[in-house]
């Protein structure tokens, strides 16, 4: 309400209604608003984004990360956000359909994109702590473990750039 640029550490909120209230307030008070997992700005994620077209037409992919469905901080919204945002950063936001299956504390979802590409999203509750992304194209494939050492500084720079330029790094629709 004070018009101060705002960064909400992931997730933006754990209910769609709360997300809409925050976005509406930002619009009403003409203030910048963003929220993201800094993993989307890790060097390895950016590198795969830059090289994705070299793989030809995207056919399939995998995004994997830890998740605690029972977390006191909003269940899967707290930690699962990392693997989801990594997927969206690399493969885009044009998701058509999502189906999933939960077994114990692990969930595997199949994310169908408008292009027809299928992405397996692995939200793992009892596997070794790791973030990983794979892209399969018609001309090649690439598997990328994600190192967290660059993401925090890169994510901070994105927020500073938002304040400097007055342009949000993600649209309101992408925040949802």
Located regions from the model:
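Rossmann-like dinucleotide-binding domain that binds NAD(P)(H)
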Residues: 62-129, 173-176
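A structural signal for well-ordered alpha-helical segments within the folded catalytic domains
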Residues: 20, 42, 81-85, 153-157, ...
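Interdomain hinge/lid region at the active-site interface
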Residues: 127-167
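Short catalytic-loop micro-motif centered on adjacent basic/acidic residues
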Residues: 7-9, 33-36, 97-99, 121, ...
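Alpha-helical hinge/cap motifs
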Residues: 3-5, 9-11, 166-167
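A contiguous active-site-proximal alpha/beta segment in oxidoreductase catalytic domains
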Residues: 7, 12-73, 83
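C-terminal helix-rich "cap/oligomerization" subdomain common to oxidoreductases
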Residues: 1, 114, 162-176
